[in-house]
């Protein structure tokens, strides 16, 4: 399925030395899009979903140094998750906000790329200790726009271009 934000995630995977935070409403495709882009990139993915794996909230959402956190994280990773080859994906990050505080140090350490996603983050993350300014790229996703919806429904490029031209010139569309 085509989403315009896929280009942003693709570029982040290729070039960025920052973590990525993907926010937006529930059920708009954040998790799906992140998984898709990581799969296409050739990176391995280690995913932690803090709603599906609530025991990991208690394990990771405690005050500890970044080094201690990294050791704990590596303990739960499969052996095939190698440094420089793996993207660590924290999904539903609003359930484990302490990780956002540690991202600066994890990014500086450089073993892995980090992507986080969650819903209602503006409300849920108010209590974090420190926002990692300069170490985090934020992408706000929205529900599909009309063009994305049309592409998902296999509307041809020619038809899309015609509809766009009609819209821009305020002309009616033929039935």
Indicate residue ranges for each PLM-predicted region:
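Interdomain motor-coupling "hinge/lid" segment immediately C-terminal to the ATP-binding subdomain
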Residues: 126-175
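Pre-Walker A adenine-sensing motif
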Residues: 1-15
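Structural recognition of the conserved hydrophobic beta-strand(s) that form the central parallel beta-sheet
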Residues: 113-119, 140
